[in-house]
Amino acid sequence: MTTTTTKAIILVGGPSKGTRFRPLSLDVPKLLFPIAGKPMIYHHIEACSKVENMKEIILIGFFQESVLSKFISETSKQLNVAIRYINEEKVLGTAGGLYHFRDIILEGGPSEIFVLHSDICCAFPLNDLLQFHKQHGRSCTIMGTEIESAYANQYGCLVRDEKTAELLHYAEKPETFVSNLINCGVYCFSPQFFDVIGKTMIDLKTSGQNITTDYPEITRKGFDVERLRLEQDIFVPLAGTGFISVYPYVGFWRQIKNAGSSVYCQELYLNHFAKTKPEVLKKGNNIIGNVIIDSTASVDPSAIIGPDVYIGPNVKIGKGVRVIHSIILDQTEIKDHACIIYSIIGWQSLIGVWARIEGIPNYTPFLYSQDKRRGVTIFGAGAQANGEIIVSNCIVMPHKQLDRNYNNEIIL
């Protein structure tokens, strides 16, 4: 009996796609930024590695290979799964890149291929998605989830036949309300879906902007067939044609749009870990809620940590410190009685005695309200806050030294 295999593709983008993640992406690529103690895409790869007969995980992007080589080597050994990186020489778009590298992806004859965007946080129920995809027999399945209607137009909106699960309509960030069922950025393809992408590309090349009568019309002005987008240029025209199913995912999900999103995504992952792998969470009399503390970090017993905190390698936490809903990165020192709330403190930073660093909790997808930024306070690498100052709702560039109070500022 022939054993079927699967592959997974993770679309990782490149340096120019991480600008909203600054200042943190100045020191580490966005996809390697630690969320809940692991690089962002580690969570994707770990989920893929748990799929039975996963033959290979392929990362596609336009980073230099050297940027990811150490991470790939270490993660491949740790999870015992083959991982490969493919560098796009030019930006091809999500569908264009998949089709360009189709021979590599389809090598070895996988029966199904997962495709995941790197900038999302969820439980990645890939085995359930795979079973659903096989049951419904279409060449593509989109994982969708329901969110609050007020935020739905920030994402790709799906209209699904409740009886057959077929995708009937797809609208990317529509101006008016279409549906509160949105695209999660996780897909399962059958190999023949690459033929569908190829057919669509041929039709687009032939007609410039319009699909042939086999598919609905595309009306993207100035269309460039070399940069084919999976969502807008493939899913939109194929909706209602019988090619695509929608898997209804019930669970946590969030897009990692900017650096501050990491704090909210960390909270979701830590809540998930409390149920699925509680052994990674720190316990103790000074710990509140879900917390991960690296084994090399030094935390004074009088410091109160949590909930929803990550403390990285070689961090020093002084007496009476309070850390809540925050990420404290490697080799940072938090002096006695400092308070850190809804903040990310970058690598090798220093927070002085009795300093207070705080962000504004904002769980919506809108970073700005009434023209004011409302979000997590972020310190770039090597930044310093002197003792007894308050820094609230700010972004601090790397290696800045703060000697007074700041509020609602980007500190260059």
Swiss-Prot record:
Record-level GO cellular component terms: cytoplasm
Region ranges (Substrate-binding domain): 6-259
Superkingdom: Eukaryota
InterPro entries: GMPPB_C (IPR056729), Hexapep_transf_CS (IPR018357), Mannose-1P_guanyltransferase (IPR050486), NTP_transferase_dom (IPR005835), Nucleotide-diphossugar_trans (IPR029044)
Alphabetized GO MF terms: mannose-1-phosphate guanylyltransferase (GTP) activity
Disulphide bridges, residue numbers: none
Pfam families with a match to the protein in the record: GMPPB_C (PF25087), NTP_transferase (PF00483)
Record Gene3D superfamilies: Hexapeptide repeat proteins, Spore Coat Polysaccharide Biosynthesis Protein SpsA, Chain A
Domain comment in the entry: The N-terminal substrate-binding domain adopts a Rossman-like fold and has a binding pocket for GTP or GDP-alpha-D-mannose. The C-terminal domain consists of a series of tandem hexapeptide repeats that adopt a beta-helix conformation. The beta-helix forms several protein interaction surfaces involved in assembly of the GMPPA-GMPPB mannose-1-phosphate guanylyltransferase complex. Vertebrate orthologs possess a loop extending from the C-terminal domain (C-loop) involved in interaction with other subunits of the GMPPA-GMPPB complex and involved in allosteric inhibition of gmppB that appears to be absent in Dictyostelium.
Subunit relationships: Component of the GMPPA-GMPPB mannose-1-phosphate guanylyltransferase complex composed of 4 gmppA subunits and 8 gmppB subunits; the complex is organized into three layers, a central layer made up of 2 gmppA dimers sandwiched between two layers each made up of 2 gmppB dimers.
Protein name: Mannose-1-phosphate guanylyltransferase regulatory subunit alpha
